[in-house]
Amino acid sequence: MSKLDDLIQKLCPDGVEYKPLSEIFNTRNGYTPSKKEKNFWENGTVPWFRMEDIRENGGILDHAMQYVSINAIKGDPFPANSIIVATSATIGEHALITVPSIANQRFTYLMIKNQYRNEYDPKFLYYYCFKLDEYCKECLNQGNFASVDMKKFSKFQFPRLPMEIQREIVGVLDNYTEVTAKIKASLEKELVARQKQYEFYRDKLLTFDVLRGGTIDFRWRMLCEIADISTGNSNTNEA
């Protein structure tokens, strides 16, 4: 039995309690300040998150690719340690935002209610939201534009675990995340090296120049001499 199993057996002898999303979090939609107001987008101090931020910088974010001025904010920025969940367009993405911020309208903010603030580790909630991502994909409204059924969204269940268990889970997942990142970085370096190797040999093999000890006997031909050339067909009646 693992340490986690021991903790659950010890601290949750009657099983794990679950609470709906709507009980644990306040939710608000993100928004985009008016592009017509240039002062909203100049000398910005408030991070404004988009899907590009997650794709570029990962799922735990403390800065954005774009900032807006405080004048662009409706009320106050959303609080630090909120979670943004993609509930329209690209479904199945989320991030933990560790600074006060806003995000565009593709996201719904999950802001933990005061009475639960000391009961949850933000990183545990971040990791558990990977299950929420999958749930969202199964709760879509019917229509041409992908969006999550927010009534069903509000009913998603979060476990109410003792903080000791949450931190144990976070520690294990942090370790796996770190190992995975190192492997990915190593593979990316290997890929770059192999690409350079490929380009070197490709250029070498396709360069017919004077070699040490002699020459290569070759002749150049115009493309039109060795190939028939035609353009593609734009006939829309063809399959």
Task: Indicate residue ranges for each PLM-predicted region.
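Short, solvent-exposed loop/turn positions at domain surfaces
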Residues: 10-12, 35, 71-72, 96, ...
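Short, recurring structural edge motifs at helix starts
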Residues: 6-13, 35-38, 144-145, 154-160, ...
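A short beta-sheet element
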Residues: 50-51, 62-130
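Non-catalytic DNA-recognition/assembly elements of restriction-modification systems
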Residues: 8-31, 213-233
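DNA target-recognition patches
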Residues: 22-25, 35-69, 224-230, 234-239
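Basic, amphipathic alpha-helical recognition segments used for DNA target recognition
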Residues: 20-25, 56, 60, 99-100, ...
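Amphipathic alpha-helical segments
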Residues: 15-17, 121, 154-199, 206, ...
